[in-house]
Each structure stands twice: as C-alpha cells, then as structure tokens.
C-alpha cells in the first residue's frame, strides 16, 4: 500500500430518523469530500457510530464506501473490536471488498495488558493480509497503548501506522523520532494535529474535516510541508470549531453541524441523543466563525 498522508476524514454515518443507515447521503458526503480535497475516507470508526451499528451494517457501510469511492482516494475501514476474533472477521471482510487498510482500536472495556494488546494486533496482522493502522484513544477505551508497545508492533509486518488520539505531543514526538521508516504517525486529535504534523507526523484523522474538508486538507498540506505560518493561520481559524465539535460527546455535535449545513440529517442512535438546545447556538457560531455558514 502506498502510504496514506494528509487529511483523513473520520466520516459520520448518516442515518434516517428511523435509525436506518442513509446510504444515499453517505455517497453524497463521499463525493463532496473528494471534491474538497480530503485525502482518505475513514468509515465506521468512533465518529461513524461503530458501537451502535450491527455487524451486517458495519460490513455494508464499508462495502458501499469502497464501491462509491471507486479508487479515487484510499478507504480506511474501521474494523476494531474488543474481541480479536471479531476484529479478524471484520478485517477479512474489509479486505474482500477492497478497503486499503483497517483502523484497529485498542480493545475497550476488557482492559488488556500491554502484552494482550500486542498479541491482539499481531494476531490481526498475521491473519489478514491488509495494512493495519493502530488506534490509541484511552479516553474512550480506558486501556492505553504505551509507546513501547507501539514501537514493538511497528516491527510486525502489515502494521503500518498509528492514530495517536491522546493529544500528548511529547509522546507523539518520541514516536515520530523512534518509529521505523515506513511507519506513519497520524494525529487523532484536531486541536493538536497541526503541532504533530509540523513535527513530522503524516496526517490527521479528523472529526473537523466532516464539516471543513477543504480547510483541513489545506492545513495538512501546509503543516507537512513545514509552512508553519500558513498552517497556524488555518489552525487558528478552525480552533473554535475544534473545541465546539466536542462540546458534547462525538459525534453528537458534528452530526448537528452537518444537518445545519444541509449536508445530511442529524439522526443518531441511542444511547446518543441530539445536541442540547442550549449548545446549538454555540456550535452554529463556530461554523459561522469558520466561514461554513
């Protein structure tokens, strides 16, 4: 696989009011992202409501995304689970339908040790011949993948990168410095992504890109080229948006924002509920400040 670099949208999963997946809107969002410069489409991750989509829906979303993208940009398929067997099954399907790589989150709830994490990810990489991007987000999973474990996994054939969503720039710097050639470090935290990329990171798996794909692409281009002045200008313009898209748990605010922009409906599946009325003006103002309304 050619290394994926740049703005990777952590795409929402559009839904109808009855909770069914809105595939026409998914296709329209993909077309919009590609037209706006998004470098890679990431589906069925946290922002894509992976915890509440059924296994058959999970697979169908990957299939539809790959089919509709049709090779225009890479597709990163969320295939993580807290069961190694389930993650392998999802990865096999992602490979079967032509995804470019899978995103594999640290197993959540069952709190594996560092050795358990190593064995989990190594088993996936050995079982399915599709590139694996690790995903460390201890704020959601509780278990934290330590840098030593990341570097150990970076030696496993087929494991090609890490989405580092702790927001810890010191940790990210050490990983960038010590990771082997060909192992990519991506930000998974919009507010600190510019710093990670200016320091040698390879891109950003972004929530903000859902509503500002062109700006996030341009931010990634500038930061990875070392153009700190331009990168800072774009970042500062988007800073209120980065903050307010997390005023309630993701993807609640970003789905409301997309609905407000007329891009897709804002329906969510329980236990997620619509954005609080008191916060709607705040999110709307951040969209206006970013020139998106």
Swiss-Prot record:
Pathway: Amino-acid biosynthesis; L-lysine biosynthesis via DAP pathway; (S)-tetrahydrodipicolinate from L-aspartate: step 3/4. The active site is at 135 (proton donor/acceptor), 163 (schiff-base intermediate with substrate). Pyruvate binds at residues 47, 205. SMART domains: DHDPS. Its EC number is 4.3.3.7. It catalyses: L-aspartate 4-semialdehyde + pyruvate = (2S,4S)-4-hydroxy-2,3,4,5-tetrahydrodipicolinate + H2O + H(+). This is 4-hydroxy-tetrahydrodipicolinate synthase. It comes from Methylibium petroleiphilum (strain ATCC BAA-1232 / LMG 22953 / PM1).
